[in-house]
Amino acid sequence: MAQQTPLYEQHTLCGARMVDFHGWMMPLHYGSQIDEHHAVRTDAGMFDVSHMTIVDLRGSRTREFLRYLLANDVAKLTKSGKALYSGMLNASGGVIDDLIVYYFTEDFFRLVVNSATREKDLSWITQHAEPFGIEITVRDDLSMIAVQGPNAQAKAATLFNDAQRQAVEGMKPFFGVQAGDLFIATTGYTGEVGYEIALPNEKAADFWRALVEAGVKPCGLGARDTLRLEAGMNLYSQEMDETISPLAANMGWTIAWEPADRDFIGREALEAQREHGTEKLVGLVMTEKGVLRNELPVRFTDAQGNQHEGIITSGTFSPTLGYSIALARVPEGIGETAIVQIRNREMPVKVTKPVFVRNGKAVA
């Protein structure tokens, strides 16, 4: 039977259509996915992300351990509360998961990992942490609410006490701070500003209700997916998995190649891939009628006249832009246009960078 987050009852009270999402009963929408999407782009919306896994790591060798575990380098994290995004790779360079890591003190870091990959992530982390003497605490006592949109921070701040407001004042993106019962982070999965707020399970329902009263719109998985796709953000199992290199998933920027003597899991495989080349992730835009869908083939002819085929990893109608967009994994050599096979029609598409909307504005 699917698990329920501490906010399950609040979702039903708000009229949510609930679905099983990787073993969790989660809201798909609360009546209109489109309205929820627009609320985040123009005002403020919120998502229950309590199904994600928060993992606290403690020990004198925690930084050393994470420098080995992750492709990005936590040596960059020197200010308490600073976070970074990284892939956690296997020995062949495939992506076990993508995650956020927070630095608090030399012996205390926090990971936030995906729900669908929870068990394999915890197994992998535990296996590799043992030689470093790391104490691992899975924070199942915490719920998490993502409040996103141009007015999200101001509306959320109406629920904060003076100390909490002071703690987040002027906080830059990709930082987190513990302020009373709330862990407040300037992170998100929408391409908008906002907070991801972790708090004790028993306080989550009251906090959710207070956000509703503050004018923050409840949003479901449907809007979360169209928002992240417009923002060009990867979804695990679609843009990447254990067989796909981060170099083929627009995650090259998350690999810290320097210092050259840092050994991390997957490094040797990645260096070979970098030398020989990989596929790459691009954006596709189709302004004609129709919708680009996952797994549709993408065909193009390179400058030498050779024909190639890639695949759409995520596709949807963009509510913000009013036409169809997609992320696609394709061979090197693609130009500015390609063809997507939709049923029996060959549809022309424009090839772009894999990001379409940032802070409510079109960039594709």
UniProtKB/Swiss-Prot annotation:
Q: Which UniProt keywords apply?
A: Aminotransferase, Transferase
Query: Pfam family of this protein, just one?
Result: GCV_T
Q: What is its EC number?
A: 2.1.2.10
GO cellular component term of the entry, any: glycine cleavage complex
Catalytic reaction equation(s): N(6)-[(R)-S(8)-aminomethyldihydrolipoyl]-L-lysyl-[protein] + (6S)-5,6,7,8-tetrahydrofolate = N(6)-[(R)-dihydrolipoyl]-L-lysyl-[protein] + (6R)-5,10-methylene-5,6,7,8-tetrahydrofolate + NH4(+)
What's one GO BP annotation on this UniProt entry? glycine decarboxylation via glycine cleavage system
Keyword Transferase among record annotations: yes
GO molecular function terms noted in the UniProt entry: aminomethyltransferase activity; transaminase activity
> Which PANTHER family does the protein's record reference?
AMINOMETHYLTRANSFERASE, AMINOMETHYLTRANSFERASE, MITOCHONDRIAL
By sequence similarity, the record places it as follows: Belongs to the GcvT family.
Described purpose of this protein according to its UniProt entry: The glycine cleavage system catalyzes the degradation of glycine.
Q: Subunit composition?
A: The glycine cleavage system is composed of four proteins: P, T, L and H.
Return the protein name.
Aminomethyltransferase
Q: Which organism is it from?
A: Escherichia coli O81 (strain ED1a)
Supply the gene name: gcvT
